[in-house]
Amino acid sequence: MPGIVELPTLEELKVDEVKISSAVLKAAAHHYGAQCDKPNKEFMLCRWEEKDPRRCLEEGKLVNKCALDFFRQIKRHCAEPFTEYWTCIDYTGQQLFRHCRKQQAKFDECVLDKLGWVRPDLGELSKVTKVKTDRPLPENPYHSRPRPDPSPEIEGDLQPATHGSRFYFWTK
């Protein structure tokens, strides 16, 4: 029925939250973007194609799981340099990277040595990429209405207007 909205149950919505501040997320953003690229792009593709967030709950859970695993690995292997780095970002006035290059270098070195992750080059994560997915295409990906016939047949005889044209003052 078109007027009834089916909402997901609370069990379907239950996930562990990623409880971090903006400075922590900003400090880890480059490595997070490289490590969780596929789940994030799968989720965004699902959201764009489906136009309904309820249909993308599984992809959203995978994004959340990837983020939690990422921050657990950072905490396990590089907690001290990462804490120094995000604390520096947090205490600079506008959360700018340029004031914290020494801490960033220590963090990047730790991540490279212990996890084997290379910091992506500037602009690498913003390149347009094709996403290979196993999800089937939606039936109507643009959610467009059916188009009317371009030239419908006119029903009945058309009579001229009884009181003349709307643009009468233009014709005299």
Swiss-Prot record:
A motif (Cx9C motif 2) lies at residues 56-66. Residues 133-164 are annotated as: Disordered. InterPro entries: CHCH (IPR010625), NDUFA8 (IPR016680). It is a peripheral membrane protein. Residues 33-74, 75-118 form the CHCH domain. A motif (Cx9C motif 3) lies at residues 78-88. Disulfide bonds join C36-C66, C46-C56, C78-C110, C88-C100. GO terms for cellular component: mitochondrial inner membrane; mitochondrial intermembrane space; mitochondrion; respiratory chain complex I. May contain intrachain disulfide bonds, as evidenced by its electrophoretic mobility under reducing vs non-reducing conditions. Keywords: Disease variant, Disulfide bond, Electron transport, Membrane, Mitochondrion, Mitochondrion inner membrane, Primary mitochondrial disease, Repeat, Respiratory chain, Transport. It is found in: Mitochondrion inner membrane; Mitochondrion intermembrane space; Mitochondrion. A motif (Cx9C motif 4) lies at residues 100-110. A motif (Cx9C motif 1) lies at residues 36-46. Signal peptide: none annotated. GO terms for molecular function: NADH dehydrogenase (ubiquinone) activity; protein-containing complex binding. One of its GO terms (biological process) is aerobic respiration. Belongs to the complex I NDUFA8 subunit family. It is linked to Mitochondrial complex I deficiency, nuclear type 37: A form of mitochondrial complex I deficiency, the most common biochemical signature of mitochondrial disorders, a group of highly heterogeneous conditions characterized by defective oxidative phosphorylation, which collectively affects 1 in 5-10000 live births. Clinical disorders have variable severity, ranging from lethal neonatal disease to adult-onset neurodegenerative disorders. Contains four C-X9-C motifs that are predicted to form a helix-coil-helix structure, permitting the formation of intramolecular disulfide bonds. Accessory subunit of the mitochondrial membrane respiratory chain NADH dehydrogenase (Complex I), that is believed not to be involved in catalysis. Complex I functions in the transfer of electrons from NADH to the respiratory chain. The immediate electron acceptor for the enzyme is believed to be ubiquinone. Complex I is composed of 45 different subunits. PANTHER family: NADH DEHYDROGENASE [UBIQUINONE] 1 ALPHA SUBCOMPLEX SUBUNIT 8, NADH-UBIQUINONE OXIDOREDUCTASE. This is NADH dehydrogenase [ubiquinone] 1 alpha subcomplex subunit 8. It comes from Homo sapiens (Human).
